[in-house]
């Protein structure tokens, strides 16, 4: 029988012609839809979107993923706490050694003086350089810590020695401020002096004439101040972190790469002095700890975490896959039987964002745990990467708990409000970001030379965000007030800049932002509001009047069913989704 002519038939052909269909035939099926088939599809759709409690009432199958997520939260949190204690000791050890190096090698250093520590005369600069090298040579006698020298080690700047004292300067430089003339060749030349540490502990400090000639050659250093770019001192030291014994772990061996920089690139008469370190962790050779406890329990616990997260990953991935298959079946059915194309937003309703979040957390946890095992075995030293992986995964695991709270109306306020308000908030933030970036660039260019909080774009953004929250408001104004004598015009501009920003963002932008959230909350409180509107998919599922306790979802429930797959199931239930 031919299709009926007329607008309705043409419209049907137009909808069916462009795409051959989601695994279905290109043309409409001449057979009318069978009510049992459609009712079965509705029932399976309703079961798919049920909560774990309703699924238990419908088929009597226990919410495996819910129980597994509870177990995973416990083991992942305990693992994070154990690793956090170990990581805290490692970070503290590196920070304390860096502070100790600054007090040892920087002449006249005091805590908190990193930004203001500098040399202002030639004598001060020479004294600071020689003091650092002298302290390096006498380190075994003056240091409270146990350090060992590293000779060479493959670094190009040491040239086989323990310490490299280098000055970098322009190839040719002549500056005559009196005549306002200069002649500069910007090519930078590097000259280094290698200093070797003593082969044995040095004599008491009173005997200054017994230093080796190779070690005292640095005293002949002559700096080319008129074209000097910077002076650097490179060396490496070894030490052992014994704090890890507190956590029943084998101590780590550290190699600290120390860089002392005397920066003269500004040629402003002030040479800032800084000391930076990089710590490299490696396994100690022949470690021996008397009565050291067995570490197998920690390894066994990490294996349990990996197995738990792997099982969670498989269950959530299976649910995502079955949701995708059910989506294709629903799309094909509606296209084949009703000639209707399902929109993208309706198809996205089959994609459970909570499962994607849990899958992501499982991947991060497994990766972080494997890295943690390598760190404890002293094969890896990436504490920072491991902490980021484990910390992010734990955050996602705890956020995933909110999914199960959304099944209860009284606990669903937060998620429902965010879901309703998110589109409006995103559009609002896009408009606000344009104004915010404009203020950032303007403040950086105009106020940067006069205000320490506006020296870089990142600092400007942090300062403005603090002003929105009402933090450091007086301090920001006071710091600009101190610069009034330098430029009255800039001070006047700063007042207009700060007052306009604060007025705009606190009294208007922030108030409107809060109003959007409040409006979304009011919407979900009223049943007749926009937040209560149903999609076409939800309306289609609502036509199924079967309750979870009706028994109609239990067909074939007596078949053997394992945790990951079902065997011997009834053919009519081959598409049933066991989503907890």
Curated annotation (Swiss-Prot):
InterPro entries, A to Z: MCLN_ECD (IPR049134), ML1_ELD (IPR047316), Mucolipin (IPR039031), PKD1_2_channel (IPR013122)
Any one GO CC term of the record: membrane
One GO-annotated biological process of the protein: positive regulation of lysosome organization
Extracellular side: 87-298, 372-382, 449-456, 478-491
Phenotype upon changing residue 446 to L: In ML4; does not affect channel activity; affects channel inhibition by low pH; impairs Fe(2+) permeability
Residue span of region Extracellular/lumenal pore loop: 107-121
Effect ascribed to mutating residue 109 to G: Abolishes formation and extrusion of tubulo-vesicular structures and decreases lysosomal exocytosis when overexpressed
Effect seen on changing residue 577 to A: Abolishes localization to lysosomes and leads to expression at the cell membrane
Disulfide bonds listed in the record: 166-192, 253-284
Intramembrane ranges, chain numbering: 457-477
Ranges annotated as spanning the membrane: 66-86, 299-321, 351-371, 383-405, 428-448, 492-513
Topology in the lipid bilayer: Multi-pass membrane protein
Outcome recorded upon mutating residue 106 to P: In ML4; decreases formation and extrusion of tubulo-vesicular structures when overexpressed; disrupts tetrameric assembly; abolishes lysosomal localization
Glycosylated residue positions: 230
GO terms assigned for molecular function: calcium channel activity; identical protein binding; intracellularly phosphatidylinositol-3,5-bisphosphate-gated monatomic cation channel activity; iron ion transmembrane transporter activity; ligand-gated calcium channel activity; lipid binding; monoatomic anion channel activity; monoatomic cation channel activity
Catalytic activity: Ca(2+)(in) = Ca(2+)(out); Fe(2+)(in) = Fe(2+)(out); Mg(2+)(in) = Mg(2+)(out); K(+)(in) = K(+)(out)
Record comment: activity regulation: Channel activity is controlled by multiple regulatory mechanisms in different subcellular compartments. Channel function is transiently modulated by changes in Ca(2+) in a pH-dependent manner; pH changes modify the aggregation state of unitary channels; a negative cooperativity between extracellular/lumenal Ca(2+) and H(+) is suggested. Regulated by phosphoinositides in a compartment-specific manner: in lysosomes activated by PtdIns(3,5)P2 (Phosphatidylinositol 3,5-bisphosphate) and at the plasma membrane inhibited by PtdIns(4,5)P2 (Phosphatidylinositol 4,5-bisphosphate).
Principal subcellular localization: membrane
Assembly, per entry: Homotetramer. Homooligomer. Can heterooligomerize with MCOLN2 or MCOLN3; heteromeric assemblies have different channel properties as compared to the respective homooligomers and may be tissue-specific. Interacts with PDCD6. Interacts with TMEM163. Interacts with LAPTM4B.
Domain statement: The most N-terminal extracellular/lumenal domain (referred to as I-II linker or polycystin-mucolipin domain) contributes to a structure with a four-fold rotational symmetry in a tetrameric assembly; the structure contains a central highly electronegative pore with a 14 A diameter. The pore is critical for Ca(2+) and pH regulation. The protruding structure formed by the I-II linkers may contain all the interaction sites with lipids and proteins in the endolysosomal lumen.
Pathology linked to this chain's protein: Mucolipidosis 4: An autosomal recessive lysosomal storage disorder characterized by severe psychomotor retardation and ophthalmologic abnormalities, including corneal opacity, retinal degeneration and strabismus. Storage bodies of lipids and water-soluble substances are seen by electron microscopy in almost every cell type of the patients. Most patients are unable to speak or walk independently and reach a maximal developmental level of 1-2 years. All patients have constitutive achlorhydia associated with a secondary elevation of serum gastrin levels. Corneal dystrophy, Lisch epithelial: An autosomal dominant corneal dystrophy characterized by gray, band-shaped and feathery opacities in the cornea, that sometimes appear in whorled patterns. The opaque bands consist of clear, densely crowded, intra-epithelial blisters. Vision may be impaired if the bands involve the central cornea.
Name recorded for this polypeptide: Mucolipin-1
Species: Homo sapiens
Lineage: Eukaryota, Metazoa, Chordata, Craniata, Vertebrata
Gene that encodes it: MCOLN1
């Amino acid at each position: 029988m031919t299709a009926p002519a007329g607008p309705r038939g043409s419209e049907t052909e137009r909808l069916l012609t462009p795409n051959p269909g989601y695994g279905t035939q290109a043309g409409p099926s001449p057979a009318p839809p069978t009510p049992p088939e459609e009712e079965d599809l509705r029932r399976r759709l309703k079961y798919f979107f049920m909560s774990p409690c309703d699924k238990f009432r419908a088929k009597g199958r226990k919410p495996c993923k819910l129980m597994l997520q509870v177990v995973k939260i416990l083991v992942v949190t305990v693992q994070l706490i154990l690793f956090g204690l170990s990581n805290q000791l490692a970070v503290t050890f590196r920070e304390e050694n860096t502070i100790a190096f600054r007090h040892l090698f920087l002449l006249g250093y005091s805590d908190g003086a990193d930004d203001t520590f500098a040399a202002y005369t030639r004598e001060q600069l020479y004294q600071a350089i020689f003091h650092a090298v002298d302290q390096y040579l006498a380190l075994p006698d003056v240091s409270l810590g146990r350090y060992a020298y590293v000779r060479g080690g493959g670094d190009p700047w040491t040239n086989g020695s323990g310490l490299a004292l280098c000055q970098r300067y322009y190839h040719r430089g002549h500056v005559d401020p009196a005549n306002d003339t200069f002649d500069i060749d910007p090519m930078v030349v590097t000259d280094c002096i290698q200093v070797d540490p003593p082969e044995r502990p040095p004599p008491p400090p009173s005997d200054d004439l017994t230093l080796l000639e190779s070690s005292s050659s640095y005293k002949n250093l002559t700096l080319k101040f008129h074209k000097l770019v910077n002076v650097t001192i490179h060396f490496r030291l070894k030490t052992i972190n014994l704090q890890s014994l507190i956590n029943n772990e084998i101590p780590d061996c550290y190699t600290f790469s120390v860089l002392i920089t005397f920066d003269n690139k500004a040629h402003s008469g002030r040479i800032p002095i800084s000391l930076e370190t990089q710590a490299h962790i490696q396994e100690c050779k022949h470690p021996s700890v008397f009565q050291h406890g067995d570490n197998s329990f920690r390894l066994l616990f990490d294996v349990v975490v990996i197995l738990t997260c792997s099982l969670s990953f498989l269950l959530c991935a299976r649910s995502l896959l079955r949701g995708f298959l059910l989506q294709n079946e629903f799309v094909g059915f509606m296209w084949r039987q009703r000639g209707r194309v399902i929109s993208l937003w309706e198809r996205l309703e089959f994609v459970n964002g909570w499962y994607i979040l849990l899958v992501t957390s499982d991947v991060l946890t497994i990766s972080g745990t494997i890295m943690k095992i390598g760190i404890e075995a002293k094969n890896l030293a990436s504490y920072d990467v491991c902490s980021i992986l484990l910390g992010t995964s734990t955050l996602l695991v705890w956020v995933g708990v909110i999914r199960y709270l959304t099944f209860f109306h009284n606990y669903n306020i937060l998620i429902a409000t965010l879901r309703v308000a998110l589109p409006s908030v995103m559009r609002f933030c896009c408009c606000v970001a344009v104004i915010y970036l404009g203020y950032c660039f303007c403040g950086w260019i105009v106020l940067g030379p006069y205000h320490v909080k506006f020296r870089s774009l990142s600092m400007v953004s942090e300062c403005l965000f603090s002003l929105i929250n009402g933090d450091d408001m007086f301090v920001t104004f006071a710091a600009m007030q101190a610069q009034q004598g330098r430029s009255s015009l800039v001070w006047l501009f700063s007042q207009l800049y700060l007052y306009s920003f604060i007025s705009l963002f606190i009294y208007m932008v922030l108030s409107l932002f809060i109003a959007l959230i409040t409006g979304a909350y009011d919407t979900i409180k009223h049943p007749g509001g926009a937040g209560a509107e149903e999609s076409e998919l939800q309306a289609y599922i609502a036509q199924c009047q079967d309750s979870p306790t009706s028994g109609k979802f239990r067909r074939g429930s007596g078949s053997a069913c394992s945790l990951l797959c079902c065997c011997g199931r009834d053919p009519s239930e081959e598409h049933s989704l066991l989503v907890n």
